[in-house]
Regions:
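Residues that define the transmembrane beta-barrel architecture of outer-membrane proteins
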Residues: 55-59, 100-104, 147-153, 188-192
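Short loop/turn motifs that connect adjacent beta-strands in outer-membrane beta-barrel proteins
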Residues: 6-9, 70, 113-124, 160-172
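Gram-negative outer-membrane beta-barrel proteins
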Residues: 7, 20-24, 81-85, 114-116, ...
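Loop-centered beta-sheet repeat module
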Residues: 68-136
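Outer membrane beta-barrel
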Residues: 1-82, 186-190
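Transmembrane beta-barrel strands of outer-membrane/channel proteins
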Residues: 12-18, 73-79, 123-133, 172-180, ...
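Extracellular loop and loop/strand-boundary signature of outer-membrane beta-barrel proteins
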Residues: 46-49, 89-97, 140-142, 180-184
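Residues on the lipid-exposed face of transmembrane beta-strands in outer-membrane beta-barrel proteins
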Residues: 1-3, 61-65, 106-110, 153-157, ...
């Protein structure tokens, strides 16, 4: 369920939600079929059962605030464990048990040259952070540690577009992603800077 308020400046979404449809998204990388450029390993390898990503979401609530056209801040909290697909075969096994933790993710987006009156090339900068409240096993010594967290940055920029090609979306785009997580807690950090 989604409700938009104040001329769509505030958006509230509640229900079975996937984080990979709302957060840590690069528009330019979405053109590729390769899963490497989708939801980053930084999150899905560091969250229980891959986190709240395709093909199953979890119970969650997302709030987005867009005070001006160029800026959006969004925050969401999700059930912390969607359970493995061999346990949660139909995607409707919910548990709000604090033992499984909760995933809280925040993202700020700054956009430029996005409307039809803009003369420059469009771009977007995103910065985000996430926290998972469950206990995690340290992969190096097996010790149980409270919580896990990380951050990320994403840049999308159109570098070249022929006159009149705005509607087709054709042109030369660049994107870069950089992120990290709490050291020694989990297995991966990521950098992705294709040209």
């Amino acid at each position: 369920m989604q409700q938009n308020l104040l001329d769509d400046r505030i958006s509230i979404r509640l229900g079975q939600i996937r984080a990979d449809t709302e957060f840590v998204i690069s528009e330019a990388s979405a053109l590729f079929l390769n899963a490497t450029l989708g939801f980053p390993a930084l999150l899905y390898t560091n969250l229980p059962d891959g986190g709240t990503v395709y093909p199953m979401g979890t119970l969650g609530i997302r709030l987005a605030f867009t005070p001006v056209e160029e800026f959006t801040f969004q925050t969401a909290i999700f059930e912390g464990n969607k359970f493995a697909q061999n346990v949660n075969r139909h995607g409707f096994r919910y548990s709000l048990n604090p033992e499984f933790g909760y995933l809280w993710i925040n993202e700020a987006q700054l956009r430029w040259s996005q409307n039809e009156n803009s003369s420059g090339l469009a771009g977007t900068f995103r910065v985000g952070a996430w926290v998972h409240t469950a206990r995690f096993s340290n992969p190096f010594d097996g010790e149980l540690l409270d919580g896990n967290y990380g951050f990320y940055f994403i840049v999308d920029q159109i570098l070249y577009r022929q006159d009149g090609a705005e509607e087709s979306g054709k042109g030369l785009n660049w994107f870069g992603r950089l992120g990290s997580r709490r050291r020694i807690r989990t297995l991966s950090a990521f950098t992705s800077i294709p040209a």
